[in-house]
């Protein structure tokens, strides 16, 4: 993970803050060539953006943890698709914040509900579609215009936060 973006919202769409940070690669890590080829061809601006101003992962995750603790409760991670994003964030929490997690079951106080809320699954239910048929390119335009999907973590977080608020209020 080289970039992390998060938006704190409630059902009404009130924004409690945004968080964005670029992480330096983990020690002894190796980039996945398929992922890098995809970013270089599909989202080179996002790749260029997230490789600037990188900070060590432990420092980045501590900053993220500090930001989370300032937010009102309950804090529930939501993502699209959650199984992928949650896996990365959870791994980095365990790897770099284990000293802050030992005394808290299920990663509290960072998130009160684990694992993450899957926006894609919720959208499938609300829109009465099969999960496999749900993606950012086929949402009704009134829910999601897809023009802000830059693959920069913060832009995508804002985009999916907006989608979630709309879905929660259908």
PLM regions with names:
Residues 37-42, 128-137:
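A structural motif
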Residues 83-114:
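Substrate-recognition/cap helix-loop segment adjacent to the acidic, metal-dependent catalytic center
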Residues 57-64, 85-92, 115-119:
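Amphipathic alpha-helical interface surfaces
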Residues 56, 80-81, 110-115, 149-155:
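Short, well-structured alpha-helical patches and their helix-loop capping segments
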Residues 76-77, 87-88, 135-170:
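Acidic, Mg2+-coordinating catalytic module of metal-dependent nucleases/exonucleases
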Residues 104-132:
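Short, flexible loop segments at boundaries between secondary-structure elements
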Residues 91-96, 125-129, 163-170:
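Active-site catalytic microenvironments for nucleophilic, acid-base chemistry
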Residues 1-82:
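Conserved non-catalytic scaffold segment of RNase H-like nuclease domains
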């Amino acid at each position: 993970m080289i970039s992390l973006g998060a938006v704190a919202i409630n059902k009404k769409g009130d924004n409690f803050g945004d968080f964005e940070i670029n992480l330096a690669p983990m020690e002894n890590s190796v980039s996945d060539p398929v992922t890098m080829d995809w970013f270089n061809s599909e989202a080179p601006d996002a790749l260029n953006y997230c490789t600037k101003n990188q900070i060590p992962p432990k420092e980045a995750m501590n900053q993220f943890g500090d930001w989370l603790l300032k937010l009102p409760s309950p804090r529930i991670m939501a993502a699209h698709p959650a199984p992928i994003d949650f896996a990365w964030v959870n791994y980095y929490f365990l790897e770099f914040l284990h000293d802050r997690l030992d005394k808290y079951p299920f990663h509290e106080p960072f998130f009160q509900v684990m694992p993450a809320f899957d926006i894609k699954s919720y959208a499938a239910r609300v829109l009465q579609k099969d999960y496999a048929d749900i993606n950012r390119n086929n949402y009704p335009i009134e829910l999601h215009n897809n023009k802000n999907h830059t693959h920069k973590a913060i832009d995508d977080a804002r985009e999916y936060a907006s989608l979630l608020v709309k879905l929660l209020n259908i």
